[in-house]
Amino acid sequence: MIIVTGGAGMIGSNIIKALNERGITDILVVDHLKNGRKFKNLVDLQIADYMDRDDFLAQIMAGDDFGFIDAIFHEGACSATTEWDGKYVMLNNYEYSKELLHYCLDREIPFLYASSAATYGETDTFIEEPQYEGALNVYGYSKQQFDNYVRRLWLDAKQHDETLSQITGFRYFNVYGPREQHKGSMASVAFHLNNQMNAGENPKLFAGSENFKRDFVYVGDVAAVNLWFLDHGVSGIFNCGTGKAESFNEVAKAVIAFHGRGEVETIPFPDHLKGAYQEFTEADLTKLRAAGCDVQFKSVAEGVAEYMALINRK
């Protein structure tokens, strides 16, 4: 059995889709469906069972036996970069993750988890090393601290000449693609621009967006990276992006190209994002490629075109 926490979320459900495409259906989905709209991400997927996050965590902490587990993909988290309740974020993203990690280590279960490019903050160097990290928000800090916790475990194991079972963290950059419709304001720029176009409006970008560049990575490619590491059992913390920053304008151009009409309008940059907003991200893929991962990433033009075709099907 494979367990996917956050399995009703965007990345988790796309990992399940990729597993299903391999014929794997013995999957336990763990999630928190207070946002009931997320159920739509599971409707077309084949799974063995569903469990509420709180019930699952209680059983993990009690050391309950789930039978043989091939791997756990830990995608469940509070992923809102605008959430400033630090106690809530640290409990969900840090404390819960530690409990699940130690459950896996005790049983030698491969543990593949979601980190984030939000760990880097305002920098132009995105290498998976502590000197380049400095989160701008509580979400990024929670992910940074869990990465550091994992690093300490690796260091301690090395000092005691021990070998730990697989632990693999993925620093997701700006992920976009199918199964994100439940995310509200946290959905991708491509999603929001498409909605604006379908409402008969022009696509709207923040003032200065021509200078904002992000590493936009298609969710299907993210799922492929996860499965590559499942197959190869490589431990480490790895960037998961295309390695090429592209502007928000490029996203808008791709959406406009699909719809065949429209032009970009600018709106004022919101005050609540000032000082907590990454203006530039670009994954350094040196470590990912050195591990042997050969997944090829779609450009914005390629990925957005595929995405638009999927979400605009009649």
UniProtKB/Swiss-Prot annotation:
Main enzyme class: isomerase
Top-rank lineage group of the source organism: Bacteria
Annotated catalytic residues: Y139, K183
InterPro entries noted in UniProt: Epimerase_deHydtase, Heptose_epim, NAD(P)-bd_dom_sf
UniProt: substrate binding residues: N174, S185, H192, F206, A207, G208, S209, R214, Y277
Gene Ontology MF term list: ADP-glyceromanno-heptose 6-epimerase activity; NADP binding
Keyword match Membrane: no
Pathway(s) served: Nucleotide-sugar biosynthesis; ADP-L-glycero-beta-D-manno-heptose biosynthesis; ADP-L-glycero-beta-D-manno-heptose from D-glycero-beta-D-manno-heptose 7-phosphate: step 4/4; Bacterial outer membrane biogenesis; LPS core biosynthesis
Catalyzed chemical reaction(s): ADP-D-glycero-beta-D-manno-heptose = ADP-L-glycero-beta-D-manno-heptose
Listed PANTHER family: ADP-L-GLYCERO-D-MANNO-HEPTOSE-6-EPIMERASE, NUCLEOSIDE-DIPHOSPHATE-SUGAR EPIMERASE
Note on domains (UniProt): Contains a large N-terminal NADP-binding domain, and a smaller C-terminal substrate-binding domain.
Protein family membership: Belongs to the NAD(P)-dependent epimerase/dehydratase family. HldD subfamily.
Protein's name according to its UniProt entry: ADP-L-glycero-D-manno-heptose-6-epimerase
Upper lineage: Bacteria, Pseudomonadati, Pseudomonadota, Gammaproteobacteria, Vibrionales
Gene this protein is translated from: hldD
